[in-house]
UniProtKB/Swiss-Prot annotation:
Organism: Mus musculus (Mouse)
Main subcellular localisation: nucleus
Name of the featured protein: Homeobox protein NOBOX
Traits of the deletion mutant: Male mice are fertile and show no obvious abnormality. Female mice lacking Nobox have normal gross anatomy and histology, but are infertile with atrophic ovaries that lack oocytes at 6 weeks of age.
Gene Ontology cellular-component annotations: cytoplasm; nucleus; transcription regulator complex
Amino acid sequence: MEPTEKLCKKMQGQEAGDKPRTAALETEGPLQDSALPIQDDQDKQSSLPRASLGKRPLSKTSEELMDAGTCRVHKAPTAAACGPQSEEEGCSPPERKAESLKPSISAVPGQATAGSLNSHEGDLKKESLEVTCQFRKKTRTLYRSDQLEELERIFQEDHYPDSDKRHEISQMVGVTPQRIMVWFQNRRAKWRKVEKLNEKETKNGPAAPSADSSQHRSAPELLDPMPTDLEPGPVPPENILDVFPEPPMLLTSEQTLTPFQNNEGAERVAVTPPLLSPPPIRRANLPLPLGPVQTPQVLPPMRDVPGSDSIYKDKAYVSWGTSIASPPTYSNLEDLGSQDYQASSQLGSFQLSQAPHLPLFPSLQSQFPYLPPFPYPIPSSMPFLPPEDSLFSFPFGFSGDSSQDYCPGPPPGQILLQPPAENMGTGPWSGHCLPEPPFPRPHYPQALGQPLGAEGYFPNLLPTPYALTMSKQSSLGLNGLLEGTRVETGSSLSKMSDEQTSSSLEQPALEEVRDKNKNSHAAGAKE
């Protein structure tokens, strides 16, 4: 109450300064007048709702002032005035809170209505979405294996069933007609996709194999001309390189039988024919004949001789059968002297005699005067020189049969085979290797024991006294000679393949043959 008393004293001092103190007996008018400004001040400080509350204590204070004195009156109203003010001040925070709550409460319903509207709209949207989702959502129908089998069977019968048939299928399968229709739609889509893929494969399939077949079409054609009934068969190029390392023995693209042209471009294909030939022959150092020679057929395998590489590099060879190689002309005939035959010249030497039926070799007589002796008869149409091997297989037997016999020969030498100009007959290798033999039919001996005459065999290669005496010899003496030599030399030398052993047996065999020839000549002269 102290602050209220102080306020009352101040107010009393102000009133005393303004107006003189009156007597104790004053009417209610001035008291009411003094109370009115206080009430006005209080009304200014307080709000409108407080006005009704402030009037009530003023009425009380007026009654109290009328009953009490001036001090009391002054004190009472102040106290009363202060009391209500304090009460008002004490009550102002809750009132303010109420006032602050009132507009908030008044605003809450609006906000609540707006929120409720928004929430209601959201609920409606959710419901609408749920409704639409329910319409869009499709449940997958799960079919059993028996149902799928039945549907597949019906689909193979009819791809487009009508409504009546769909109803029947639905009753059979146990699924609604709508689901049956959907299943058939999906099945038709799958069927169309498979059909398109098959069409693409059929279109692209024949195109690629046709290109491949056109590219590789020449390979089977090359194999058609090759003989299929021959036992040896074609030799691969790798084996040819290993066995015959020199280039003349290989067939190149220029030497093929028929150059095939491929569809994409013209390119020659090297075809390796089967190398079918008689037993291998050593290649020698003497040149080939200089005359025109018929084209042979097949290249025979020839073994390398040391010292002959410088002469026969990039040269072709004449052989039996059909071949592309042609006999080359040699300009170094003078260089090939008799140095290779000095070792064999000790056995005997003679000069070639001009034969009337060999006009192609007149120059060889002067260029090659020294040749080793050869004691056996050979067909006259073939200039036959001794081979390098000590054992050489003749294409005919000594008894006239087609078996092969081996005869001795000097170490260095060469075999020159000249195909005749006559028609070719059936030869000893017709059933083994070659289709055609190199020997003519009229020169085959019925028996080699016949006397040497017009049908003699190489009389020009024999020494002159031998040729003269043997032309007059009887068939019995020659038969005995040839049979004896065949028994002795053929049996002993046919089993030997090594060159050292054969060269050691070479000279004694020839000496025995000479002795027997002399004995036969002596017997013929005595008769």
